[in-house]
Amino acid sequence: MESALSARDRVGVQDFLLLENHNSEAAFIENLRRRYREGLIYTYIGSVLVSVNPYKELEIYSKQNMERHRGVNFYEISPHIFALADNSYRALRTERRDQCILISGESGAGKTEASKKILQYYTHICPTRNNTHTIRERLLQSNPVLEAFGNAKTLRNDNSSRFGKYMDIQFDYKGAPIGGHILNYLLEKSRVAHQNHGERNFHIFYQLLEGGEDLLLKRLGLDKTNPQHYHYLIKGNCPRVSSISDKNGWKVVRNALTIIGFEDEEIQALMEIVASVLHLGNTQFGEDEEGETHITTEAQLQFLSQLLGVDGSVLKAALTHKKIVAKGEEMISPLSLEQALSARDSFAKAIYGRAFTWLVQKLNRSLAFKDEIYYSSKCSSVIGLLDIYGFEVFQHNSFEQFCINYCNEKLQQLFIELTLKSEQEEYEAEGWERVEYFNNKIICDLVEEKHKGIIAILDEECLRRGDASDITFLEKLEDTLGGHAHFITHKMANGKIRKAIGREEFRLVHYAGEVNYNVNGFLDKNNDLLYRHLKEVLCQSTNHIVSQCFHADELMDQRRPETAATQFKLSLAKLMDILMSKEPSYVRCIKPNDGKQPGRFDEVLVRHQVKYLGLMENLRVRRAGFAYRRSYEAFLERYKSLCPDTWPNWHGNLPEGVATLVKHLNYKPEEFKLGRSKIFIRFPRTLFITEDALEAQKQTIAVTLQKSWRGYRERANYHRIRHAVIVIQSWWRGVKGRRKAKHRRQAADTIRNFIKGFILRNEPRCPDNEYFLDHVRFSFLMKVKRNLPKSVLDKSWPKPPPSLTEASEHIHRICIRNLVNDYCRRIQPEWRKQLEQKVVASGIFKGQKDGYSRSVPKLFVATRLEAEEINLKVLQTLGSDNKVKYGIAVTKYDRHGFRPRVRQLLLTTSSAVLVQEAKIKQRIDYGALLGISVSSLSDGFFVLHIPTADSKQKGDLVLQCDHVIEAVTKLAIMADKIHNVNISQDSIRFAIARGKEGVIDFTSGSDLRVVKSKNGHLSVTTPRIS
């Protein structure tokens, strides 16, 4: 409640009951204007919420705002739709009585958005249970689906609901949403085939064309082009709207269908129906020379038959002929061009209308509470949301506007019954005077009365045989209703009014104002007939949805179906029964301007809506007796602090407490009255003075409460700290004493175990010496850890105790192995290769040949011949695949005369090659090499043994070089003959051609000498080297 006077002057009052001049419509509208200018779009009339469409996003619908309104009293915070929703929810929880929220207002006033905000609030604040998350999501996602198929852009609203919707949300005994149910009313099917200029067809057509996947559109026979290419989408000349994203809308609808539980096949069938309507619109007719009607667009007919799952020839015949059944006989007659076009449009409207009904039924199956029969559980309650068309007055008003405005009359009657009438009854119950108000029952009777009402006359004219027409219907209305105060026609009007009424129009004086209705099309729209031949075609459809919408039973039923107006009247009657069984809350929506512009307030337009919504009547009835009324308990609870006798608590009965309070506040007798259970305050200024006094008193109370609270808090804090200190002290002293005693016991046990273990240290391990032995082991291991060798050459090692000698040896070996492994991991690749060769040399020559120990420190080189020392022709002969890996200068001795010859020995990847300058003298493949022989002395001789069977070879090869250990090692590695190296002690035998053998004798001497001895052997004398 606005308490500060400056705030009230700036933003107005948040409850119209508090207006000083409550009879002034100008004051009412000015209060709306002030609040709208400050971004305050909600205002109360008692328990009725008035909402003004801001035409922009406001930061008042966040989750934080939802939490602010959860469980808060209706009048404790500023007006908000969340407050009204929470009030209904709490009444449902506490009183276990079904609730309903009625949202009304003209098209574009924000009814659909209001219902969505209420639904979002419930899905956020309600408790959860195992399966409620799915229900919440489906409840929310049902809105975009219904909007896509049931909403359209009109001149006044870019997202106008073209059908009425009533949704029940079912809650369990804990208040969690467990199900839902939707009722739909009077879908504007005529929009499928015709739209006024500046309006569009239903959203789904544009969303499919703009956002549908290429593959889907191809299957449906649609082009992702301008909607102007489709006859049913060009009537309004408004294919695209800047405020609507059809592409994003398709994504939202497609996702919502999946969440709700539609199968892919169902979505495909549904889109096929949507596409079939577009193809129907593009189906054109012509007349031949004989005047017979035929279809001129065969391609459209082919797509139609595929999408609807019917035979093409049968469909073609049904669109150009009609079947009449008379006295059991069937007759088929051709349709004129005009009749064929009308039948096509009726066909499209019937398909779309029944598909929409199927869609709502599918949503209901998805939202149904599976564990219990709907409405049957005693442990569940419902909140109903009514979002239905607002009062409509266009330049051209037809049958649809007549039904919509009739619906609004019924809702106004319900509002009168549940609100204004109940208000009057409250006054009478409290003993106040009766207040008069307008009751629109006379208008409802004018429309719906049996035999005399407009609907009854319309039905009678539709059933009359002969030349019944819209004009004869108008004449019948004039004859029957000519004297009614709320009915006027051109013929009945006086000269001044007659100019405003057409000859084919009649005027109804609604509660909201006067509306002229053009009778053209009333009979056809009321009949809403579909030729039997077309019904038969659809009954044979293989489309999953069409087959469910059109049953063969319809063809067997000979009764005339109820007219559209009668169906609507009956469904409205059922809706009224549902709403009357629930406790209502009201949201009255107002459109501030026709341009959908934020911040613009059109006073003339707002005044018209305030009038036809009956807001001033509602306010006058509430204020006729008293502006403010509250129960004794609520009034005393709020204002008891203003009187010392009632503060802080009143222990007597409530009426006496309120009387004591108002006496202290100096209320005058004419300013208030005490009823049986409530206090009534007549003037808003009395309440404002009381509110201002409460604001001032709050400051005093706040200071007192702060002072008392601080004193209490400090005393409590002191006692808490003192008690904590004492507890900590006593606890800590006990801990210290126990810890000290435990430490002494452990020390004594340790000393005792140590002494006993030392005495038995040389005995086998037992409980008496295990502590000492563990200590010795630990000490030794720590000593080893501190004195580990840093390199392989470090031979130091701590001396172990006798019991750990074996373990010490194992650890020492492991340590050395780790050092070696670590050393090996750090070796560079070239050094690794060097060591590998040295290891091979060691395995061959160590302890076998003189001079080996001197060769160990000397590194093996990669080659003893540089690249330029090898003749280029030799390299070319060897080729690129046979690269030289090692080369060394050698002396080759002839096999017969042992004449020395200078040669080069080249080791390649596959063979050993002996070269004389530019000529290859001999090539020995490694695979053919039988072995290698060297002497045990320090000479440089070695013999390569070759198979004697090889005709290309002349025998074994006797060679001598300065680095025999290096050369033989490399040759053995490359030829893989490591185990085929023979070290001879005295002589080496080698093969000569034709099975002969040669011998080399080795003797030790002071100098190196090589001669041929008398016995034909090669004698080699070499000094001994250690």
From Swiss-Prot:
Ligase as UniProt keyword: no
Domain Myosin motor: 12-695
GO biological process: actin filament organization; actin filament-based movement; endocytosis; glomerulus development
N6-methyllysine, modified sites: K349
Molecular functions per Gene Ontology: actin filament binding; ATP binding; microfilament motor activity
Localization (cell): Cytoplasm; Cytoplasm, Cell cortex; Cell projection, Ruffle membrane; Cytoplasmic vesicle
Organism of provenance: Danio rerio
Sequence ranges assigned to domain TH1 in this UniProt record: 849-1024
CDD domains: IQCD, MYSc_Myo1
Statement: the UniProt record of this protein carries the keyword Ribosomal protein: no
UniProt keyword annotations, A-Z: Acetylation, Actin-binding, ATP-binding, Cell membrane, Cell projection, Cytoplasm, Cytoplasmic vesicle, Membrane, Methylation, Motor protein, Myosin, Nucleotide-binding, Repeat
The IQ domain, residue ranges: 698-727, 721-750
Pfam families to which the protein is assigned, alphabetical: IQ, Myosin_head, Myosin_TH1
Modified residues (N-acetylmethionine): M1
Protein name according to UniProt: Unconventional myosin-Ic
Gene: myo1c
InterPro entries cross-referenced by the UniProt entry: IQ_motif_EF-hand-BS (IPR000048), Kinesin_motor_dom_sf (IPR036961), Myosin_head_motor_dom-like (IPR001609), Myosin_TH1 (IPR010926), MYSc_Myo1 (IPR036072), P-loop_NTPase (IPR027417)
Family membership noted in the UniProt record: Belongs to the TRAFAC class myosin-kinesin ATPase superfamily. Myosin family.
Main function: Myosins are actin-based motor molecules with ATPase activity. Unconventional myosins serve in intracellular movements. Their highly divergent tails are presumed to bind to membranous compartments, which would be moved relative to actin filaments.
GO cellular component: actin cytoskeleton; cell cortex; cytoplasm; cytoplasmic vesicle; microvillus; myosin complex; plasma membrane; ruffle membrane
Binding-site list for ATP: 53, 61, 104-113, 157-161
Matches recorded under PANTHER family: MYOSIN (PTHR13140), UNCONVENTIONAL MYOSIN-IC (PTHR13140:SF862)
